[in-house]
Amino acid sequence: MAKMSTKKVYSFLLQAFIFSAIMLISNIIATHLPIPMPSSVIGLVILFSLLCLKVIKLEQVESLGTALTGIIGFLFVPSGISVINSLGVMGQYFVQILTVIVVATVILLAVTGLFAQFILGKDEKETEDIKELKVVNKGRKHGKVA
């Protein structure tokens, strides 16, 4: 068995502690929210916020995150078993569940498309403004300003 350096062990333990602390905080928040919200989603938002605010550096969580991503299929096994155990309930409400999935997908696609068009439209307008500025500046250099 390969001997792990003390630094690697410390790094792994620190990363596990960071993830555990974030999940503990997200579980506490989830139990106190008036609406049902998965603690894992809250944890992702907290982790993302801490990374954006540079409270936590990417290097402090990157290797454990990569390792967990590598075994993500295994981590979904309990969720799959829960879905299989709930097939009776899902069969009872199949039409409602299917309707929600279809409507949510259509809304998501529409909002994503509109947002992309909005962003691309702004980008094209900025590109046109820059081209117009270059033409005006070029005219000024040659003394052709209207």
Swiss-Prot record:
Membrane-spanning ranges: 9-31, 35-57, 64-83, 93-115
Membrane topology: Multi-pass membrane protein
Pfam family, one: LrgA
Cellular localisation: Cell membrane
Keyword Secreted: no
GO BP annotation list: cytolysis; killing of cells of another organism; programmed cell death
Membrane listed as a keyword: yes
Listed GO CC annotations: plasma membrane
Main localization, broad class: membrane
Biological function: Inhibits the expression or activity of extracellular murein hydrolases by interacting, possibly with LrgB, with the holin-like protein CidA. The LrgAB and CidA proteins may affect the proton motive force of the membrane. May be involved in programmed cell death (PCD), possibly triggering PCD in response to antibiotics and environmental stresses.
Family stated for the protein in its record: Belongs to the CidA/LrgA family. LrgA subfamily.
Name assigned to this protein: Antiholin-like protein LrgA
Origin species: Bacillus cereus (strain ATCC 14579 / DSM 31 / CCUG 7414 / JCM 2152 / NBRC 15305 / NCIMB 9373 / NCTC 2599 / NRRL B-3711)
Protein encoded by which gene: lrgA
